[in-house]
């Protein structure tokens, strides 16, 4: 209790005072200290009956304060829970609205795609019917039926593909023969270092010569392209305006053949172009000699 705490505090203070005071002062003040102790004990004994009421009132106030704090804590917790529940409901509502919006957009997109698909099908059907009407009005390829005409086109395409394959094979064989003639076979078996060095030098000379030829031919081609452009500009200046070329309708068969030829042309390398340029130059020189 508070009374015992006060007594313990006084005893501690007395012990501390006893330790601090010296020998003579201790003898002189012993009687005075004893009288003070008796007086304090009497005061404590007189004030002891009123203390339980004070302690009970303090305990009531403390308990009341604790109950108020607990009530405030419960109210704060309930408010926090209410806010969290409100936030959760708000998030659920937003999520529901978002799902509904996404579903609505998806339905609109599906409806738009369906309408576009139906429109395309109607256009395709109209185009097909128009083509059938045209086929009925005029006969194609000597009065052949559509099935026979389709078969004939298929045979023509197969023949053209075979011819292109044979032509590509012949070009590859000619290219390989030209390369083999230009670069003879050699063997390094049984050769010493000096012979290998001489062989490397020979190859280096050939490579340098070929590079020079490539550079010369490229320069000639650039010069010819420049001259062609100059002549084209002069022709356009003479006519006074640019002449629009006459456009023609391209056949599907021709476009397919051109595509096959482009694929075959991509496989060729610079040596094939070099060979064709040399042949062109030889033909040009032969023509100039005949003109002279």
Curated annotation (Swiss-Prot):
Q: Which residues carry this modification: N-acetylserine?
A: 1
| UniProt xrefs under InterPro entries | Troponin, Troponin_I, Troponin_sf
Q: Where is the composition biased (Low complexity)?
A: 46-55
Stretches for region Disordered: 1-149, 255-292
Does the UniProt entry include the keyword Nucleotide-binding? no
| Protein name as catalogued | Troponin I
User: What SUPFAM superfamilies would the database entry show?
Assistant: Troponin coil-coiled subunits (SSF90250)
Similarity comment: family membership: Belongs to the troponin I family.
Give the organism the record lists. Answer: Chlamys nipponensis akazara (Akazara scallop)
Report the superkingdom from the record. Answer: Eukaryota
The terms describing its cellular component in GO are: troponin complex
